[in-house]
Every structure is written in structure tokens, then in C-alpha cells.
Amino acid sequence: MCIGMDIRDFFAQSAGRWFSQRTSHHLAFKQTESGKSQLTIELLSVDDPAVIALCQQYDMDPAWAVCGARVSWDGTMEWDNEKHEGSTVLVPIMDQGSRMEGKLLREMGYAEKAPVAGRFSMGSDGALTLITEYETIYSEERLWFASPNLRLRTSILKRFGGFSMASFCSEIRLGVTQPANS
């Protein structure tokens, strides 16, 4: 738990390579599935061309960008065993007068393959909550660090006023070596 963490700190702590294991519950079908993927999160500076382009796409002044990240994923889900891969750029824009809330610009949504802006808020416990409303789907995710190398995520998807899916992910940082015993 990282008390007092803001969005910039959260992005910085998220940078790196992660192994993600997901369990999803499809409530309408009463089915559960699991999946795994490798995530790569690369920090982008506010003057990175991808950050500037995304701000312009949303008619936002790039000077309002707090930071940026490129998130890439490569994984499989149990039900189809096909590769699911892609990437997106994320740019947080703080609400005026707030260090803890704002808009999160996305190059591409996860539930729909179109650009979408969501809302973010940082809790006093260091957890990041993301709310994204697509044309037909409402998505709410909560991400937090159990330790510097273990990130947890819960998410719900709602369609047409009812819950359709709930997920839990554990994400373990890759490439971390144990310190030598003294």
C-alpha cells in the first residue's frame, strides 16, 4: 500500500515488465475462465510525440498532460487459446485544482476498439480507480500495489444496467532479482 501516491507516482511504479494472471467470472453465463499475459509498461515524457498526438486527438492542450505510458500486452485466455495482443497509450489529465482526480485519455479502449477517455481517481490508500463508459459498456477497475513488485487489479463490466463480468488479476513484476544474502 502506497499512501499519498498520486497518478504520476503510480505510473512510475508501474513501469516495467509484468506477468499477469487473470480470473474472470462471466455472470450471465455462470462461467469462469482464466488467462495469463505479459504486460510491458513504458513511461513516456509529456513531450513524447505519442502523448502530444493523443492530447490533440481529444482536443486537449498537451501542456495539461501529467505524464504518459505505453502499455503493451501479449497473452491468452483459456476459452480460445488464441493470442490476444496489442498496445495503447495512456495520458492522465488532472482536474483543475486536484492532484488526485482527472481524465485518463486512451488511444484505444480495452472493451471496444476505439479511442475513449475515462475518469481516474487516486484513493488515500494509493489505489487507482478507473471508470470508463463506452457506448454499451460501463467499466470500473481498481489497481493497487500490495508491494513494489506485486500489483493487484479488480474490474467489473456492466452491460445494459446489469453486471456481466467481474475479474481479478495479480501482476508480478518480471526481471527482479533477489538481493544477495549477507
From Swiss-Prot:
Entry's InterPro entries? Calycin, CpcS/CpeS
Q: What class of enzyme is it?
A: lyase
An annotated Gene Ontology molecular function: lyase activity
Q: Name one Pfam family in it.
A: CpeS
The EC number(s) this enzyme carries: 4.-.-.-
Q: Which UniProt keywords apply?
A: Lyase
Q: Which domain of life is it from?
A: Bacteria
Q: Which family does it belong to?
A: Belongs to the CpcS/CpeS biliprotein lyase family.
State its role: Covalently attaches a chromophore to Cys residue(s) of phycobiliproteins.
The name on file for this protein is: Chromophore lyase CpcS/CpeS
Q: Native species of this protein?
A: Thermosynechococcus vestitus (strain NIES-2133 / IAM M-273 / BP-1)
